Structures are given as C-alpha cells and as structure tokens.
Amino acid sequence: MSDEDLFLTALLDSLGKEVNTVLNNSPIKVEEKDGDFKAEDIPSPSSDTWVKLPEVVAVVCDLKGSTHLGTGKHDTSTARIYKSGVEGAVRVFHEFGANFIDIQGDGGFGLFWGERAHERALCAGVTIRTFSEEFVERLEKRWPEGLPETGYKVGIHAARTLVKRIGTKREISEQEAVWAGRPVNYAAKCAQSADRHQVIITQAVWDKMKDNDFIAFSCDCGDGPTANLWTDVTVDRLPEEDRDAVVLNSPWCKTCGPAFCEAIMAGEKKRDIPSAVRTGINRMKMQKALEAKRLRDSSRNSALRGVR
C-alpha cells in the first residue's frame, strides 16, 4: 500500500473515531444566555459548551446575479463592485447595532438579539433594500451596457439558536461561529426566494411587527396611509408549516423614511391611521385566517377519507 493510501485510510479512520466519540461520549453543555450576551464570548472550539439564545433575528442579504457581475469587466472593476456593494450592506448592519455580522461572498447576514432586536433588524433590512436600489442606479450609470440584473434580496426570520465556534483548534483562521438553528437558514431561504429590491419576512417575524403602525401601513405621502404596503407570499423553500410570509417592495420614503425609522428604533408604535384603512388591514387578516382554516379543514377531510 502506498503512502497516499495509508494517509487516506488513516485520516478516514481517525474521522470515524472522532465522530463516534462526539456522538456517544463527548460531554456537551448548553448554557442559556439573555440579550446582554456578547458575540466575543462565543465559546471556542476547545470548549464543550454551546450557548443558547432564546430568540435571534437574522437578516440575510444576497446580491442577485453576482456571478455575472465580473463578466466582460476588468478585475479592478469587479473588485470595486463587490467592495462598494458588500461593504455598504455590512455598514448598514453595523449602524443598526447587529450583535454579529458575517460576510459571505456577495452578501452576508446580521444577527440581532436583546433590546429591540426585531425593530433594529427590520430597519436594517429595509435600509439594505433602499441602498440596493441606489447602488444599482450607480452601477448602471458606470456601466450603461452589459450589466446583469442585480440588487440585494433580503430575508428575515427569528427563532432560538445555539452557537459555538467550530474548527481547527489553535488555528484562528480555520475557526468560525456556527449558528445551529432556524434563524439564518430560514432567512437565507427567504432571501433566495425574493427578487432584487425585495424584503421577505416570515410569519413569525410579521406577527411581532404587524401591530406597529409605522411598519404595517405606508406613510402619509400621496394618497395617505394604505394597508397594502406588505403583501402575502409563500416561501416554497421552507417546510410546509412555515411557508407563510410577507414581502415588501418599497424602499424608505425619501420624505418620511428618516422619521419613520427613528420612530421604529425608539419603540413607537401608534400613528393616526384612518379607521377605514385600519379596518381594511383587519379584514385582510380575517380573510387570511379563514383561508388557512379552510385549507386545514380540507387537509383533515382528505386524511379522513384516506383511512376509511
């Protein structure tokens, strides 16, 4: 047997033993932390401890068509596009106080927990969507021909998660924080399902936001506040029971956006909304609830017919 064969055989044998040890004998400790937990305190690979955070809001941004952005351009031009786009999104996460930021190729994600995590996350998501449109306008001016359709797609989800740094011990460059749970996974699937300049948030997040008038209703510009700012959407990439979501197509209003963002971040929730508009959104909620009940009843009846 050659040295290469011996190396591979030994490596696979060692990996198998390590997996068996971790699955059956390795001590694992889970510590629940509150909103004051700091990302720099995430346990290292040498620790047996995982940290559990009861609720983390993940905002994932994904740049549409990024694989084609370098086609026909010089390396320096491609680098400028990535630098300006990705750094712009990362700065948004930073400015809205993301507790953890991870850059992944043409995008990344920000994680929010603690005080007003949902509000900070939503404002960050809408701001990235707004930045996306302005970013693309600048790209189109710089390269009026041959630019692929691009722009940020944003997804948001919230749930509990476990976190720990995993990788090669004593090799910092080979270690990363692993977020085990649904927040990043679901938010990424929402972003993948969105089109450019869209924000998709899961029903779990919308349930926390729908009673905030600064979020649920459009601003007073034009025809005044309306209840059609968000529309229902189904995220087929998610498990069937979690596919309900809503999508936002609009950026921050140039006139009202700064004040609305400030109000949301300050925890304000109520505006002077005409009763007819408020009744309209309540009617839509009722129609959605009735439709969901109809689907549940239909599924239950089909199941009963199947066992007769």
UniProtKB/Swiss-Prot annotation:
- UniProt: Mn(2+) 1 binding residues: D62, D106
Q: Which UniProt keywords apply?
A: Antiviral defense, Cytoplasm, Lyase, Manganese, Metal-binding, Nucleotide-binding
Cross-referenced Gene3D superfamilies: Nucleotide cyclase
Q: How does it assemble?
A: Homodimer.
Catalytic activity from the UniProt record: GTP = 3',5'-cyclic GMP + diphosphate; UTP = 3',5'-cyclic UMP + diphosphate
Protein name, per record:
Uridylate cyclase
Q: Could you say which cofactors this protein requires?
A: Mn(2+)
- Residues holding Mn(2+) 2: D62, D106
Any idea what job this protein has? Pycsar (pyrimidine cyclase system for antiphage resistance) provides immunity against bacteriophage. The pyrimidine cyclase (PycC) synthesizes cyclic nucleotides in response to infection; these serve as specific second messenger signals. The signals activate the adjacent effector, leading to bacterial cell death and abortive phage infection. A clade D Pycsar system.
**Organism's domain of life?**
Bacteria
Q: Does the keyword Nucleotide-binding apply?
A: yes
Q: In the UniProt record, does the keyword Nucleotide-binding occur? A: yes
Molecular function as annotated in GO: lyase activity; metal ion binding; nucleotide binding
Compartments, as annotated in UniProt: Cytoplasm
User: Could you tell me the Gene Ontology terms of the biological process aspect for this record?
Assistant: defense response to virus
Report which gene this protein is encoded by: pycC
Q: Which Gene Ontology cellular component terms are annotated?
A: cytoplasm
Q: What is its EC number?
A: 4.6.1.2, 4.6.1.26
Specify the signal sequence span.
Answer: none
What the record says about family reads: Belongs to the adenylyl cyclase class-4/guanylyl cyclase family. Pyrimidine cyclase subfamily.
